[in-house]
């Protein structure tokens, strides 16, 4: 019997870019729903504004470049970037913040470098850093979980607040930010960082009303939602475990060592993993296939280094959370990491020391 030898590739992947991006968006849904439940409809308003801005910006630039914008938009990469940026900023940030940030992500970070597959930095995180540096007040107006607030804005209130700064009933963001017990510190990372700076111990800082044990009310639920989505992506083989595993392990190891050294001055590993955006960053942001490392060994190094920088900046830096800065730092190191972690080419032996190239 004669057998036909098929040409390569011998491993066939039926998913195209658009399908992969859609699956990542689907995996974000549990976390987005929980984030909306605990922190208000402003999350959905920001997502809507970001997606509209991303699509319009992408279509305009591609039209100017004489490219097929319909095919490019159908790959959903711009929409995914918009969603990641939208869920990273405060839900009630002014409308122009997300519009400027999304335009910057698509136009300056993605298209300026040549479009999908050519950007050096993660577009969503580059835009986040630009917004944080340019508009620090608007980017730090986080609200406590709605169960702690005296006023719980609905969808109409959220739309009013994003576009006018006031709810439909006339409450300002400062009034909405005030918790039922008068506590206005919005995020667990903010609360602990401020408490430690004021001389409180870690355990004393956890006595704030925004904590339930060592976990921020609402925040650990949101992190769990993104964790479930991330595990789905690994199971569906959309992403590998190397980057999220390395990132979580790197941050947890650093936190564990320092917590053992002085439990009064340093937060526990559990606190760092479930409070803030570490899980979101590990599964959905650092795993960007364009700006991340491409080898398995390199991915572990890349992820672990991001986890290290997250802990360092959170603990000793000027920003409570540090996912964006850490990802961008390691984006710059990707060429070096890939160079030294390239697997040996099949059929070639490893070059011995002193052997000419």
Swiss-Prot record:
Residue positions where FMN phosphoryl threonine is found in the record: 187
Xref: InterPro entries: NqrB/RnfD (IPR004338), RnfD_bac (IPR011303)
Bilayer disposition of the protein: Multi-pass membrane protein
Transmembrane segments: 20-39, 83-105, 115-135, 154-174, 214-234, 241-261, 266-286, 300-320, 321-341
Xref: Pfam families: NQR2_RnfD_RnfE
Main enzyme class: translocase
UniProt keyword Transmembrane helix, yes or no: yes
GO cellular component: plasma membrane
Domain of life per record: Bacteria
Keyword Transcription appears in the UniProt entry: no
EC number: 7.-.-.-
One GO term (biological process): electron transport chain
Cellular compartment(s): Cell inner membrane
Cofactor list: FMN
Keyword terms: Cell inner membrane, Cell membrane, Electron transport, Flavoprotein, FMN, Membrane, Phosphoprotein, Translocase, Transmembrane, Transmembrane helix, Transport
Major subcellular location class: membrane
Subunit composition and interactions: The complex is composed of six subunits: RnfA, RnfB, RnfC, RnfD, RnfE and RnfG.
Family note: Belongs to the NqrB/RnfD family.
Role summary: Part of a membrane-bound complex that couples electron transfer with translocation of ions across the membrane.
Database matches in HAMAP family: RsxD_RnfD (MF_00462)
Full protein name: Ion-translocating oxidoreductase complex subunit D
Source organism of the structure: Pseudoalteromonas atlantica (strain T6c / ATCC BAA-1087)
